[in-house]
């Protein structure tokens, strides 16, 4: 299998052109290639496929083999992948995902994509659609307890579920201990991504993420979008902010005129290769 390893702010995936090679059992392949000791090493696997309703289709799998609806960092890399490999000559393209069709605007320098702006669509705030078991709409400050830990979560879906809470010192937070308690909490019928957020000022947010099916990652694009939405709903920031993740910064904007979230950030190719599967 021919592959390209890429990352968006350190959120790394193995990218495969599935328009030119047949990939069977992607769940198993994702578990294999993601292993950082016995595989290539990644947060998961991304397949680029033909689409009947967009320029390309993206399927993505977490490191545990589960299929995810969408990943903001991964979709930026998909844009770079198809442009840099001359699969398209357009700098604005559409990508079909399980979370709907996304529009990508790519900044190109020296015939290579360096920055990608993604129209992430409208945030989903209905509890049953996120989904989260709550009577609130929108779900702001839902008190959830797991073992001895209790937090007020604001819940948002960007095509995948996110639960956001605010703390004082995100750098020192024991995420590996507490993240999974809420990822698998009964309040979330399809599990959830969990974001712990520290407010820096009214246009800067610092966050760490416990990703559903992957654990802590260096960055999560949909998570950054969900965090901005939650922070606007709670009156903490304006509609455009810098979101600081372990792997770097994303610019997130919640556009008032169309209600869409726009995410801008880098995409980087690490290396290419072939592996027996």
Curated annotation (Swiss-Prot):
GO cellular component entries: cytosol
Keyword Metal-binding: no
Involved pathway(s): Amino-acid biosynthesis; L-lysine biosynthesis via DAP pathway; DL-2,6-diaminopimelate from LL-2,6-diaminopimelate: step 1/1
Catalytic residues identified in the record: 71, 220
Annotated TM spans: none
Pfam families hit by this protein: DAP_epimerase
Broadest EC class assigned to this enzyme: isomerase
SUPFAM superfamilies: Diaminopimelate epimerase-like (SSF54506)
Keywords from the UniProt entry: Amino-acid biosynthesis, Cytoplasm, Isomerase, Lysine biosynthesis
The keyword DNA-binding belongs to this UniProt entry's keyword annotation: no
Binding site for substrate: 11, 62, 72-73, 160, 193, 211-212, 221-222
Reactions catalysed: (2S,6S)-2,6-diaminopimelate = meso-2,6-diaminopimelate
Site features described as Could be important to modulate the pK values of the two catalytic cysteine residues, chain residue numbers: 162, 211
EC number(s) on file: 5.1.1.7
Gene3D superfamilies named among the record's database cross-references: Diaminopimelate Epimerase, Chain A, domain 1
Xref: InterPro entries: DAP_epimerase_AS (IPR018510), DAP_epimerase_DapF (IPR001653)
Subcellular location: Cytoplasm
Gene Ontology biological process terms from the UniProt entry: lysine biosynthetic process via diaminopimelate
GO molecular function: diaminopimelate epimerase activity
Family designation: Belongs to the diaminopimelate epimerase family.
Function: Catalyzes the stereoinversion of LL-2,6-diaminopimelate (L,L-DAP) to meso-diaminopimelate (meso-DAP), a precursor of L-lysine.
The protein's assembly and partners: Homodimer.
UniProt name for this protein: Diaminopimelate epimerase
Gene: dapF
């Amino acid at each position: 299998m021919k592959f390209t390893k890429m990352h968006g702010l350190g959120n790394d995936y193995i990218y495969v052109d599935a328009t030119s090679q047949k990939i069977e059992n992607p769940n198993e392949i994702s578990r294999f290639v993601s292993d950082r000791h016995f595989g290539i090493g990644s947060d998961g696997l991304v397949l680029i496929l033909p689409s009947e309703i967009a320029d390309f289709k993206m399927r993505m799998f977490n490191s545990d083999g589960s299929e995810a609806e969408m990943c903001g960092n991964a979709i930026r890399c998909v844009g770079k992948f198809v442009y840099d490999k001359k699969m398209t000559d357009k700098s604005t393209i559409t990508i079909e995902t399980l979370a709907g069709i996304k529009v990508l605007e790519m900044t190109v320098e020296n015939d290579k994509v360096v920055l990608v702006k993604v129209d992430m669509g409208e945030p989903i705030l209905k509890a049953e659609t996120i989904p989260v078991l709550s009577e609130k709409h929108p779900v702001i400050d839902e008190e959830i307890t797991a073992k001895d830990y209790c937090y007020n979560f604001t819940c948002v879906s960007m095509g995948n579920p996110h639960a956001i809470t605010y703390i004082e010192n995100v750098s020192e937070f024991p995420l590996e201990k507490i993240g999974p308690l809420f990822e698998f909490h009964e309040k979330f019928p399809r599990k959830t991504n969990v974001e712990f957020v520290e407010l820096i000022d009214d246009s800067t947010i610092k966050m760490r993420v416990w990703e559903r099916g992957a654990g802590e990652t260096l960055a999560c694009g949909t998570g950054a979008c969900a965090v901005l939405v939650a922070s606007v709903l709670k009156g903490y920031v304006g509609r455009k902010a810098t979101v600081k993740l372990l792997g770097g910064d994303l610019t997130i904007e919640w556009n008032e005129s169309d209600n869409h979230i726009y995410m801008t950030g880098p995409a980087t190719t690490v290396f290419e290769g072939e592996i027996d599967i």
